[in-house]
Amino acid sequence: MFGLGRPQPTSAEKIAAVENELKVVAEMHSRMVKICTLKCIDKSYREGDLSKGESVCLDRCAAKFFETHQKISDQLQKETQARGGGGFGM
């Protein structure tokens, strides 16, 4: 009744969904680190610590990366709901 006719996922399916989500988050983090490092940190590594400019650049880059990711996720969710789908293959 409350599941809207869909069977409840099994424990194995729940674990697989969490593992998949973790994989997606890890891949997103890797992409963000790679992109922001290439953009913000000089290849010559003059100092052991980040300069103020590098630190600010990395902070802004990461914020923009996550903001863009959120906007894309929201748009995909709206499009999926508009088509009447319940989710990404689930």
From Swiss-Prot:
Keyword vocabulary terms for this entry: Chaperone, Disulfide bond, Membrane, Metal-binding, Mitochondrion, Mitochondrion inner membrane, Protein transport, Translocation, Transport, Zinc
Cysteine pairings via disulfide bonds: C36-C61, C40-C57
SUPFAM superfamilies for this protein: Tim10-like
Membrane topology listed for this record: Peripheral membrane protein
Cellular component GO terms held in the UniProt record: mitochondrial inner membrane; mitochondrial intermembrane space protein transporter complex; TIM22 mitochondrial import inner membrane insertion complex
GO biological process: protein insertion into mitochondrial inner membrane
Tagged with keyword Chaperone: yes
Domain-level remarks: The twin CX3C motif contains 4 conserved Cys residues that form 2 disulfide bonds in the mitochondrial intermembrane space. However, during the transit of tim10 from cytoplasm into mitochondrion, the Cys residues probably coordinate zinc, thereby preventing folding and allowing its transfer across mitochondrial outer membrane.
Family classification: Belongs to the small Tim family.
Protein name as it appears in the record: Mitochondrial import inner membrane translocase subunit tim10
Source organism of the structure: Neurospora crassa (strain ATCC 24698 / 74-OR23-1A / CBS 708.71 / DSM 1257 / FGSC 987)
Gene (UniProt): tim10
